[in-house]
Regions:
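Core SAM-dependent methyltransferase catalytic element
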Residues: 187, 200-221
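A short acidic, Gly/Pro-enriched loop at the edge of an enzyme's catalytic core
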Residues: 111-123
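Acceptor-substrate binding/catalytic loop of class I
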Residues: 164-179
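A short glycine-rich, Lys/Arg-flanked "PGG" loop and its adjoining helix->strand segment in the class I
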Residues: 136-148
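Class I SAM-dependent methyltransferase SAM/SAH-binding core
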Residues: 53-112
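Conserved beta-strand signature within the Rossmann-like core of class I S-adenosyl-L-methionine
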Residues: 149-156
């Protein structure tokens, strides 16, 4: 499956940024596999406590939220996604949590976060940074909705790795660690830690790949 045509690479890139149709469901499943370790690493950086309000940007089908609730069942989770298909899929697949009101998945435009100022304790996101239309403005939105002492955890694959992946030339904005740190600090966040890990994954093109990912934890103080 590794020898995809340019058109297939474009379609894959489009699905990764905005899953839709039958291929969108399949792409979400492949992302679960490819990003599982990365998602867990990001979640592990959240200081979780009872009644914490957690917002995730781009949860896809959201199958990983069970890991959050295993850490503490008394959390409030909101997942926002630009894909209507993913919002529907995540709501159905996580009915144990959505039916009880512990979790909710909502559609977003990817630019404005429809939440009150200082209403969220922690925000996390994995592999969405590349698709933000206006990254500085979006980070300002994240800063706005976070409470004081709020946590932001970003998981992404840095430019040095991403530029070797053929489909990332279609619609991906690539970042190195320093550029992300600078963006965060420009908005007013304080960087608490930056960690990197190298892993072997089954990529979205179906091949086994070695990749390095970065997790940055920042605070609103």
């Amino acid at each position: 499956m590794g020898n995809l045509t340019e058109q297939e690479l474009k379609e894959l890139a489009s699905q990764l940024s905005h899953p839709k149709g039958e291929n969108g469901i399949a792409t979400a499943k492949s992302m679960n596999v490819a990003n599982d370790n990365m998602i867990r690493n990001v979640i592990n950086q959240i200081d979780i406590f009872d009644t914490i309000n957690i917002l995730e940007i781009g949860p896809g089908n959201g199958l990983h939220i069970n890991y959050l609730f295993e850490k503490n069942p008394n959390i409030n989770y909101i997942g926002i996604d630009i894909s209507e298909l993913m919002v529907q899929d995540a709501t159905e697949l996580n009915s144990e949590f959505t039916n009880s009101g512990k979790a909710i998945f909502e559609l977003t435009d990817g630019e404005i976060i429809e939440k009150e100022n200082s209403s969220i304790n922690a925000i996390f996101t994995v592999n969405t940074l590349y698709f933000w239309k206006n990254p500085k403005e979006y980070l300002q939105e994240l800063f706005r909705v976070l409470k004081n002492d709020g946590q932001l955890i970003l998981g992404f694959v840095p430019k040095s790795t991403m530029e070797k992946i053929p489909f990332t030339k279609y619609g991906f904005e690539l970042y190195d660690n320093e550029s992300v740190q600078n963006l965060l600090e420009e908005v007013g966040f304080k960087i608490e830690k930056t960690v990197s890990e190298t892993e072997e994954v089954l990529s979205n093109t179906g091949d086994k790949k070695i990749r390095t990912f970065t997790v940055i934890k920042a605070l609103k103080l």
